[in-house]
Amino acid sequence: METITIGSTGPLTGGAASYGISVKQGAEIAIEEINNAGGVKVGDKSYNLALQFEDDEADEEKARTAYSTLMDKKVDVIMGAVTSGSSLAITDLTKADNILQLTPSGSAAAITANDNVFRLCFTDPIQGKTIADYIIKQGYDSVAVLYNNSDEYSTGVYEAFKNELIETGNPELLVAEESFVSDDVDFTAQLTKIKATDAKIIFVPAYYEAAAYIAKQVKDLGLEVEIVGSDGWDGVLGQVTDTSVLDGVVFLTPFYPTDPSEKVQNFVKTYKAKYNNAIPDQFAADSYDSVYVLKAAFEKAGTKDTADLIKAMTEISVDGLTGQISFDVSGDPIKEAKFVVIENGAYQTKDID
């Protein structure tokens, strides 16, 4: 049987390695399942899937080099990059090479500007808007924001959040805007300023490494405040030794491993068995779903031609781990967001009244 090769680039080493490893492992499980079930039927031919994954260390220049390596190896589609900066770094390259690009986890709005690029995860604007609407709906009268102004993801979510407060006529809810930069671990100065405002809730659009430090320091400084996070908080439980510092934290996510659905629990069981009892995160789930989306696109197109694949991407609907997935004409996903709350060291569904 011939092979369709999925080319992927993401961090397997460096500070963001956990994201790339999750994406690689989620894809490997999906590919194994698909191949065991007979592969991908494209027209009247069946193909096995294979994954070629290159390490980009979440670095834009290294992402371009990794992409070049993938093209030299004659991959059929690109599933990447993992991070927003690296995804943006290769979009014009994939456009010039006329190859379909699907990022499982790059959330910056500009990534899907080219018609050959799609994304599986939520966009930054959707996250910011959804979390602002949550805060308004829950009746909080004051909110502080602590975001990473050196990171495109964090800044993008923050800006969309602020814009939604303005557009809904609630700008007065935002009583403090504090920032930090990547690799910061001491947030005392920012949190002390926030404490002085008596904000009832802090919104932290950030990845889980910084999020863990912030949550602990909120407790250490005695802030009596709720915390809400973006999807970058997924995995934060693995960053703390005392999970009680995270009790009550709410964050937006497309996936959580304690979801009781049969589909999710089967995936979690397989993932743990294959990867030394590791618990899958949303990056693994988005990647798993991305492989099934690509399978559906090839089968809908009936050909490996890029133009036909692009058309097929806007016509398919896939029942994934992260929900029912389809795509709009701009390449962004249409699927439902979920909120989870951390309680007693576990992720639980957050009911939104």
Predicted regions and their residues:
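Periplasmic-binding protein-like
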Residues: 70-82, 102-104, 144-147, 198-208, ...
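Beta-alpha junction/loop-to-helix N-cap segments that form part of ligand/metal-binding clefts
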Residues: 19-22, 40-111, 120, 180-184, ...
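Signal peptide-proximal N-terminal region
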Residues: 4, 25-51, 166-172
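Extracellular/periplasmic periplasmic-binding protein-like sensory domains
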Residues: 215-288, 341-353
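An alpha-beta-alpha
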Residues: 117-178, 201, 294
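Extracytoplasmic "Venus flytrap"
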Residues: 7-28, 54-60, 83-85, 146-155, ...
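Extracellular/periplasmic bilobed ligand-binding domains
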Residues: 157-252
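Segments of small-molecule ligand-sensing domains
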Residues: 273-284, 295-346
